[in-house]
């Protein structure tokens, strides 16, 4: 089973999470026909334990999930949001407790808006920003 942070987590403005490009896009009226957004999504942020149990009940061995860059680094760089780190530790620990191998995807197209405002993927500094982010995840 594979998921993506923006599509399932919800909690778009909770516990210190910064704004991602998808948060910005989906908040603007008429960008999405029925004006829906991922503010709540399926609320994985609050229901991860029961959702992971559901994955296990499907006889899966692996759970692939992406990390919200802006949940770890609200501005895309600089200050680390410990609540974000703690959340993903709980997700990983729950996977392991359920006998699922956690497969972490570092980035699934939800760039922090603050980095997009600095040019995003067109800014050569993105290489350093991404490397710093991945280094945090590896710790």
Briefly describe each language-model feature range.
Residues 3, 16, 31, 36-39, ...:
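Residue-level signal for the start and early helices of compact helical domains
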Residues 2-12:
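Hydrophobic alpha-helical membrane-insertion signals
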Residues 52-139:
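Substrate-binding cleft and catalytic face of glycoside hydrolase catalytic domains
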């Amino acid at each position: 089973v594979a998921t993506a942070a923006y599509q399932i987590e919800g909690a778009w403005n909770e516990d210190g999470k910064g704004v991602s490009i998808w948060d910005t896009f989906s908040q603007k009226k008429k960008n999405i026909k029925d004006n829906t957004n991922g503010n709540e999504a399926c609320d994985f942020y609050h229901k991860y334990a029961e959702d992971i149990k559901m994955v296990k009940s499907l006889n899966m061995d692996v759970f692939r999930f992406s990390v919200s860059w802006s949940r770890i680094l609200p501005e895309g760089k600089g200050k680390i949001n410990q609540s974000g780190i703690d959340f993903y530790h709980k997700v990983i620990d729950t996977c392991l407790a359920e006998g699922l191998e956690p497969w972490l995807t570092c980035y699934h197209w939800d760039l922090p808006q603050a980095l997009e405002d600095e040019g995003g993927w067109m800014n050569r500094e993105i290489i350093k920003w991404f490397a710093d982010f991945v280094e945090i995840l590896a710790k």
